[in-house]
């Protein structure tokens, strides 16, 4: 597989929120981008149109928790770009707040499949392609975890927190597996960020309610997380692997 002319990145779950913000940052850096979405095609297509004035971009619908759809997604990337050099594992869900005693197996399995299996599958397919590239080509993966991996989110989202704890472990283990090939693997742990995900958890204004707990006294913005992701992807972080960066305002 020949090396892409420019850094080429897949950002899963990038129709809105942190994923969309990351796409915008990387587009301004002239990276080639694959926008991925599961169901909100209008947001993803609008973003694709916006970024197409800056760089080469494709938009692919796929549920990255389903292996067959992941394979099809990467096949489209191969066709459009000849492969990829970078991956942002961003896709994930949050379900309505409840204590563990009220959770059933269906909910827990959905959470783990969407938030964990998806990252394993995409990391596997990305690594296959990265390993075919010359070691002179910079290659990196950034997994999106959460500050919940540290706090546990008791009485709200212990299943979500557990899924993100798994991502921290994946990041560490995979970074060691891929280090001999020069492929870097890191993660970011966003804290309370102003995105739509809180509404899906049943509390649209959760960031405002909890902002006084944050040492910086405010919630974060998606582009603040995006810039951290972009740095970890870039050659400025060429000696950084196996690291998990908290983007939490000090929480």
Q: Where are the regions a protein language model picked out?
A:
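Active-site Tyr-X3-Lys motif and surrounding loop/helix of classical short-chain dehydrogenase/reductase
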Residues: 72-79, 98-102, 106-113, 209-212
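Catalytic Tyr-X3-Lys loop
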Residues: 101-121, 142, 167, 216
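Conserved glycine-rich cofactor-binding loop
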Residues: 15-17
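Catalytic loop of short-chain dehydrogenase/reductase
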Residues: 136, 142-166, 171-180
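Conserved glycine-rich Rossmann-like NAD(P)H-binding loop of the short-chain dehydrogenase/reductase
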Residues: 29-45
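C-terminal substrate-recognition "lid" of short-chain dehydrogenase/reductases
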Residues: 218-247
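Alpha-helical segment proximal to the catalytic Tyr-Lys
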Residues: 128, 176-177, 238
């Amino acid at each position: 597989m020949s090396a892409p002319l420019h850094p080429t990145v897949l950002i899963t779950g990038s129709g809105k929120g942190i994923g969309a913000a990351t796409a915008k940052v990387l587009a301004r850096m002239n990276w080639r981008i694959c926008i991925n979405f599961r169901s909100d095609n209008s947001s993803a297509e609008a973003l694709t149109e916006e970024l197409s004035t800056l760089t080469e971009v494709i938009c692919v619908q796929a549920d990255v928790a389903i292996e067959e759809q992941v394979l099809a997604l990467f096949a489209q990337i191969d066709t459009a770009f000849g492969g990829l050099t970078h991956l942002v594992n961003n896709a994930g869900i949050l379900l309505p707040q409840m204590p563990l005693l009220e959770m059933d197996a269906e909910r827990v399995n959905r959470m783990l499949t969407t938030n964990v299996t998806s990252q394993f599958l995409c990391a596997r397919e990305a690594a296959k392609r990265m390993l075919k590239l010359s070691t002179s080509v910079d290659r990196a993966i950034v997994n999106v975890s959460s500050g919940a991996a540290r706090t546990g989110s008791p009485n709200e989202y212990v299943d979500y927190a557990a899924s993100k704890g798994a991502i921290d472990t994946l990041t560490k283990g995979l970074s060691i597996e891929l280090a001999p090939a020069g492929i870097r693997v890191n993660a970011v742990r966003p804290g309370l960020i102003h995105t739509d995900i809180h509404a899906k958890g049943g509390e649209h204004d959760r960031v405002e309610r909890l902002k006084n707990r944050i040492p910086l006294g405010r919630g974060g913005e998606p582009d603040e997380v995006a810039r951290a992701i972009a740095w970890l992807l870039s050659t400025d972080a060429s000696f950084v692997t196996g690291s998990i960066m908290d983007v939490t305002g000090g929480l």
